[in-house]
A protein has these predicted regions:
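Elongated, amphipathic alpha-helical interaction scaffolds
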Residues: 1-193
C-alpha cells in the first residue's frame, strides 16, 4: 500500500481541508482546544530572478477560535530543503501577513499570529523534533515574569512552532508523538530507492 506523504504541499492541503484533522493538527501543537477553524490555502508563485525559476507554493492560513474565545491567525509553512533564499521568503511572507487586516463577521480586525514551520531538514543545533518558541513577558526592572498580557504586544509579536520531520522517531507515547508520526519519513517511498 502506498501512503501519500504529508510533507508535500498538495497532500498537506488535502489533509487540512478536513476540519477535524485541521483542528487536531493545530490544537495538538498549540496545546489548546480549537472550537472553530477556517483554513485557507494560499497559492502563489515565487519567482527567483537569479536562477530564472518560478516555484509554485502553497502556504496555509487558519483563523482559529480557542475554547476560551481567543481568536488568532495560524500560518503554516512547509519547507522540504534548507535554502538561504527560503529564509528571506519566510520573513517576507510573515511581513506581508502582519500588514493584512483580518475579517471576522465582516468586521476588520488585527489578529495575533502564530507560525508553524514544518521542515524537511534538520537544524543541527536543535535535536528535538518539535520546538516551541514562545513569548514571555518579563519585567526587567523587578526581574520577574508577568502573567498579565497586552493585546497590543500580542499583535506585534508571535509564538512559533517548528517541526523537524527528519528528527521524528517511532515513539508513540503522547498525543503530540501520534500527530508527528504521520510525518515520519521512513514509511514513505521516494524516487531515491
Amino acid at each position: 500500500m502506498v501512503i501519500a506523504n504529508p510533507i508535500y504541499d498538495v497532500v498537506f492541503k488535502r489533509l487540512m481541508e478536513n476540519d477535524k484533522v485541521a483542528k487536531f493538527f493545530i490544537g495538538t501543537l498549540l496545546e489548546q482546544t480549537i472550537e472553530t477553524i477556517e483554513v485557507k490555502p494560499q497559492e502563489f508563485t515565487y519567482v527567483d530572478e537569479l536562477a530564472g525559476l518560478a516555484v509554485f507554493r502553497l502556504d496555509f492560513i487558519a483563523t482559529i477560535k480557542t475554547e476560551n474565545g481567543e481568536r488568532k491567525k495560524v500560518l503554516i509553512e512547509i519547507q522540504k530543503a534548507r535554502n538561504q533564499i527560503d529564509l528571506m521568503r519566510f520573513r517576507n511572507y510573515l511581513a506581508e501577513q502582519y500588514k493584512k487586516e483580518d475579517s471576522i463577521n465582516d468586521e476588520k480586525i488585527i489578529l495575533p499570529i502564530t507560525t508553524i514551520y514544518i521542515l524537511g531538514f534538520k537544524l543541527p543545533e536543535i535535536e528535538t523534533p518539535c520546538l516551541k518558541v514562545d513569548r514571555n513577558y518579563k519585567d526587567l526592572v523587578n526581574s520577574k515574569t508577568l502573567t498579565t498580557k497586552s493585546d497590543f504586544v500580542d499583535k506585534l509579536t508571535h509564538d512559533c512552532f517548528i517541526v523537524q520531520v527528519n528528527r521524528i522517531t517511532d515513539r508513540y507515547q503522547t498525543r503530540l508523538d501520534k500527530l508527528l508520526s504521520i510525518f515520519e519519513q521512513t514509511n514513505f517511498v521516494d524516487d531515491k530507492k
